[in-house]
Amino acid sequence: ELGSSDDQTTWVDLYKRIAVINSTLEEIDRLDLKTDQEKADYYRVKGESLFLRGQFYLILANLYGKPYNPRTASSDLGVPLKITSGVEHDKDKDTQFERATLDKIYSQIESDLLASLEAFSHSSKHVLYRASEKASRLLLGRVYLHMQEWENAKNILEPLFGNIALSSLVAGDTLSEDNRFLNEDNTELIFSQNSQFSQVCWTGNAPEFCVSRELYNLYDENDRRKGCFKKNVDTDSLALLYKYNTGNYQARVSDVLMLRAAEAYLNMAEACAMLGTDDATANKYLNELLRNRIVDYQDQTYTGEE
């Protein structure tokens, strides 16, 4: 994790968060709900908690386990799966927790996100820094892509379109140091779990936030991402200067655990392409995204193999 030299920081931090979520989910079911507002708050907190637990286990599974493979998921080990608030202790065991298989972990992630969608159907308010129905739907679509369940991915993502908007880079104000892509007014942003680090850690100038000259040169000259996100300098790498705010102040919008509309379009295109029977729909979503990124873009037709 950035900002720490301790290799266990991410592991410890995420399990601490999961422990709080487990307690929250158990306690809110003991509440005596009387008013409509109390019921709405209950569903909002439940939906947010389930979304976050699913998100955190997805991160843990990908950081510390193998990539999901449907053929081996029932035997591939991931991380310990803890979904209760109690403290277990068995004096006869050398270790209190064992690694769960990937199929069990992903099944729990799927269950949490589906349950969060149900909760959000009773409390639909959307705030950038809070989980929402749109955030849960997009994250679950990503999970289904990991699981190679293309039809499920397509079906869960489809209701998003019409309720999300792409940010156009081919019209309007040019991005600059005073007008960054990642900001609270960008309608493309669906969810941002803002950074806990001061913004100085996320300036986009550090070496780990640079892209190679080779990658930079792959962008077409009409692709606005080439100039909007990157500053061209006389080195072998380029800083993502116009994507992040710079300066030493508390972070707000951050791409750490961010969800935005562009991913929905890419994920939908991937799901349709991988189905092998819906190339037309895959092209539709990919072309719509690129029309908002490349000046004078002409729609392309690709096959699933491409």
Regions found by a protein language model. Give the residues of each.
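Short coil/linker segments at helix-helix boundaries
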Residues: 40, 63-107
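Aromatic- and glycine-enriched pocket-lining scaffold segments that form the walls
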Residues: 120-154
